[in-house]
Amino acid sequence: MSLDLPPPPARGCRSTEVLKERGQREVFCGLTGIIWLHRKMQDAFFLVVGSRTCAHLLQSAAGVMIFAEPRFGTAVLEEKDLAGLADANAELDREVDRLLARRPDIRQLFLVGSCPSEVIKLDLHRAAERLSAHHGPAVRVYNFSGSGIETTFTQGEDACLASIVPTLPATEARELLLVGALPDVVEDQAVSLLTQLGIGPVRCLPAHHAAEAPGVGPNTVFALVQPFLGDTHGALTRRGARHIAAPFPFGEEGTTLWLKAIADEFGVSADTFEAVTAAPRARARKAVAAASEGLRGKSVFFLPDSQLEPSLARFLTRECGMSAVEVGTPFLHRGILGPDLDLIAEGPVLSEGQDVERQLDRVRAARPDLTVCGLGLANPLEAEGFTTKWAIELVFTPVHFYEQAGDLAGLFSRPVRRRAILRREAAE
């Protein structure tokens, strides 16, 4: 059966030499992952062991007031903690005791490291083991780092899920595991498509509740829905699970190839695949064509932010008619992103890490039609006449699978359209 997709390029970018940069970075820390994880995991609580700056970041980013009792909070390290004048472990134990007494619905507690806790070498791994022994089995305590010293933006989710994997129950069952946090409506769409293909049981990590945690074993196969889950990928592989490599489900082509890789793994017939995917594929294609009209023939430059960049570059170049000048990403995991890189025609610079001043020099030299970058860089670039897209929106907006393909294209076309309108108004 032909999938009716454009042929792959003669030479992709998988073997392209990567420009590795290790300079000043302009990116959020891994604590920001808590913003979407606390909404997804409904019996979990994320306790950041950090400073008031950490608390302000989370409260501002989440858009909630602390008296609304969200499923996250900050155990603030005071000056006496930082100076070693107080027993930080004893203070932490007291805070956890108070929290669990006040919130008996908590079944998973994550101690999240920050820059201050890293600086004073507070051993949160040992603290998690101690608190799990004290409060278990009703509450399991995990730890991971969201420190800006160690992590960037989406790595917080990766560290969180990787901390869960060793505790998942063992199973010999043949199961498909979808790995990565998605909005509920998008996750439901994915599971529905897979169920219609006759694939199951389908389990998800992270689960909504601790009691729904999936098992993992040698008969588990897993598909990533987010490209930034390198540590989680490694943890699952060590448990015996096998990764189904595929482009990520952004746009019509990415979603089709992602589903096809899973369908082939489970022996789904070509006729069944066509019957299930034909209608949503047609809707996605139509939506992308309409939303990307203003993008065709234009160039895009990705500054590193979320690790979604290679997959999105594939979407823009293959489905929206753009050309990529540079695809920058905080970390490039070829084992995970290889199928996407195969579909990006040779030509753009691939860069890993960041030296922000040098990258900005390359942006100014290339003069791309659209620059995808972090919040802190967007306004200065706009002031210089560049058209920018906030990279953070691509993480917080539902953009996966067929029904969101048009919305994804629209996120890129809106700033281009806005710039064109402003130019017309200025000319008048």
Swiss-Prot record:
The answer to keyword RNA-binding applying to this record is no
Q: Entry's InterPro entries?
A: LIPOR_BchN/ChlN, Nase/OxRdtase_comp1, Protochl_reductN
Q: Which Enzyme Commission number(s) are on file for it?
A: 1.3.7.7
Domain of life, source organism: Bacteria
Cofactors per UniProt?
[4Fe-4S] cluster
Which pathway does it operate in?
Answer: Porphyrin-containing compound metabolism; bacteriochlorophyll biosynthesis (light-independent)
What does the UniProt keyword field contain?
A: 4Fe-4S, ATP-binding, Bacteriochlorophyll biosynthesis, Chlorophyll biosynthesis, Iron, Iron-sulfur, Metal-binding, Nucleotide-binding, Oxidoreductase, Photosynthesis
Residues that coordinate or bind [4Fe-4S] cluster: 29, 54, 115
Q: Name one GO molecular function term.
A: 4 iron, 4 sulfur cluster binding
Q: How is the cofactor bound?
A: Binds 1 [4Fe-4S] cluster per heterodimer. The cluster is bound at the heterodimer interface by residues from both subunits.
Reaction catalysed? chlorophyllide a + oxidized 2[4Fe-4S]-[ferredoxin] + 2 ADP + 2 phosphate = protochlorophyllide a + reduced 2[4Fe-4S]-[ferredoxin] + 2 ATP + 2 H2O
Pfam families listed in its UniProt record: Oxidored_nitro
Q: Which GO terms describe its biological process?
A: light-independent bacteriochlorophyll biosynthetic process; photosynthesis, dark reaction
Signal peptide limits: none
- Establish whether keyword Iron-sulfur is in the entry: yes
Q: Hey, which family's this protein in?
A: Belongs to the BchN/ChlN family.
NCBIfam families xref list: DPOR_bchN (TIGR01279), PRK02842.1 (NF002768)
Q: What does this protein do?
A: Component of the dark-operative protochlorophyllide reductase (DPOR) that uses Mg-ATP and reduced ferredoxin to reduce ring D of protochlorophyllide (Pchlide) to form chlorophyllide a (Chlide). This reaction is light-independent. The NB-protein (BchN-BchB) is the catalytic component of the complex.
Its assembly, as annotated, is:
Protochlorophyllide reductase is composed of three subunits; BchL, BchN and BchB. Forms a heterotetramer of two BchB and two BchN subunits.
Protein name from the UniProt record: Light-independent protochlorophyllide reductase subunit N
Q: Which organism is it from?
A: Cereibacter sphaeroides (strain ATCC 17023 / DSM 158 / JCM 6121 / CCUG 31486 / LMG 2827 / NBRC 12203 / NCIMB 8253 / ATH 2.4.1.) (Rhodobacter sphaeroides)
Which lineage do the record's taxonomy fields give for this organism?
Answer: Bacteria, Pseudomonadati, Pseudomonadota, Alphaproteobacteria, Rhodobacterales
